[in-house]
Amino acid sequence: MGLVVVGLALLDISLWWLVLDYFIEEADATHKAVMITTTMLTFGMGASTQALFARVGGGIFTKAADVGADLVGKVEAGIPEDDPRNPATIADNVGDNVGDVAGMGADLYESYCGSVLATAALGAAAFIASPELQFNAILAPMLIAALGVILSLLGIFLVKTKEGATQLQLLRSLDRGINTSSVLIVVASFIVIHLLGLSYWICGSVITGLLTGIVIGKATEYYTSHAYRPTQDIAGSAETGPATVIIKGIGTGMISTAIPVITIVVGIILAYLFAAEMDMGNMSMGLYGVGIAAVGMLSTLGI
């Protein structure tokens, strides 16, 4: 699903750019670029609106179908879960596809499109005084995202495990693919920035985004995998009854948000400073760096 999401996102963005470039008439090339990029932001708003309904509505339908099927099947009829004799199993399977495939795909699609489109708009505004660099700044996030798709293909082929592998081994295999693609994307970003004539400081923002994504992924893995202590502690709390499981689970869930929040804040500050060349007053370049960091973070989305 990851490759479908990023492929459709880049295809849609490219097509809309060509359409708007044909229909928008503006004598000044720099102002035309600003018009196109700001107009394309509405594309991201539409994707976000659709993702809201698909993700939230799909999640509610998924859980309702799941609980309903279990109540009828296990409690009332006494048959196993997902048994074909239970008609509610059909709704349960449909709900899994709606919530876990359509909803998640729409969510990732709008995040991916939003990062690329916002960065392009910020680039158009930051380099409005230089037509050549302005177009290159608009092109940079799209090229980084496109190279990320290609390099993600290589990472996918590195995700291999043996039969009967444990969950920890599966996670290590996935890490191998993501880490390899991330390193290659850093190298590719340096080449892209060099060819486009932009400041090498922007590469620091790309690296910041990639590292931020990796840290958030590791934190999520630590707090949700049964191979690590937090989940094991929640399971162990069941020895004293369901109340302690709920309390321990809520507490662990609250603590687990600390690392991602702190990482995102630090990542935003570093990405801003790198692109602004350590000048806090250079807001236009700093915001462009934050956008580039978001593109870098999502460049491995195909995996």
What are these regions (language model features)?
Residues 1-303:
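Hydrophobic packing and interface segments
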